[in-house]
Amino acid sequence: MHPFTGLATREDGAIKVCCRSLPIGNIKDMSLEEAWNSDAMKEVRRQVLNGERPAVCQPCFDLEDQGVQSLRQRHITDSSPESRINLYPNALDSLSADYSMPFELPTMEIKINNLCNLKCRMCNPLDSTQWKDWSSIVSHYEKEGNYLVDAVKSLGLEKAPYVGLFEDKLHFWENLEKLLPYFKRVEFAGGEPLMDPSHYKILDLLSKN
């Protein structure tokens, strides 16, 4: 249901189908509105409706192949009132023949930056500014080919721990304002959102709608 109901962002600028998926674009190169009906997103929708496995959804399929319930499965079951299939039962009504959809997302999962006051053991520099000893664990991520290795290196997070690529992107804020009348649910993660001034800016926008 995720490709038909919302988008997710990651601190490095990634725009994703959901918080678990691989990126379909980046805020540096495209807006949320462009990503919503990009060729990549429309192809994901086509594959989902044809029972195929989109490459960007591989993290969920990897879990399912091991017998573990994935985020994808949790949101397509009607046994949970919180599943997207129950929250947005009419999501596919506005789907066009070319797999495009109106830019009227009912939900978003937002990560704007990695500002945080904690260094949880399961975390990493992309999600917390407190992670300053990445070199001590990076080898474990390298062995599994984790995207974090390249992300941390390309953003220079080994030396300067803060990353926030959304704050100065005018089109991001313009797109958020466009979506305000349609939002039914917005989920925040980080970093620690309550430390982030941008989080309060979004809350102010939401409170006006």
Per-segment meaning from a language model:
Residues 67-209:
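Conserved alpha-helical substructure of the radical SAM core
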